[in-house]
Amino acid sequence: MSLEGRVFAIAGAGGLLGPTVVQRLASKGARLALAGRDKAPLDAIAAEAGGADTVSVDLLDAEATRAWARGIVERHGRVDGLVHLVGGWWPSAPIEDASLEDWRRFHDLLISTYQHTTQAFVPHLLASGRGRVMIVSPGHAQAPTHRNASYAAAKAAAEAWTLALADRFRGTGATANIVVVGAIVTPAMRTESPDKDYATFTPAEEIAQAIAYLCSDDAASMNGQRVTLRGAA
């Protein structure tokens, strides 16, 4: 399952999953372009993976996001995939007390950034002939509780956007898929808390493995799928 010579953009690469996903794709021979709010952690992740392009981008700025996509194509001549790892969570009030401000924050973080990145990259992914789009989504996007209504609604909207992308890609050679996970455990978390029971968590390594598979030609027939990993509710 080689990704040799292919170019992948990773949005939100400085977050929880970034280091593991970057390492996995780099190990398969991919050329990577990393974006996030802060460049310093991206530079560290890139160095650990043997090199990658890094840039600080405000993904809420649609034009800045398009400029990032254009820059990748100018540098590498192509872009073959977008892995959207932008995420975040904070506690919410019960549904009757949930504020519109809470919803707006989740919408900006989880929907607007995703809309901007996909709209910036879709023309290039179609030109690739085998473009890929992936997001990571929690199981409870499809089974929300009253205390995470705004978060779950935003994630469900991101899933719907992905399925709409899959429809756009039908018959083009490009694909869009969703990796469904539970609470995530990273190698760093295991090092920091080695005695904690992570049996019900989704390992970051398995998420990265699923993403690498979906990036490959082996997954060319998978489009509009929810790939559920262990730990997903």
Question: Which residues make up each language-model segment?
Answer:
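Active-site loop of short-chain dehydrogenase/reductase
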Residues: 6, 78-80, 125-139, 171-175, ...
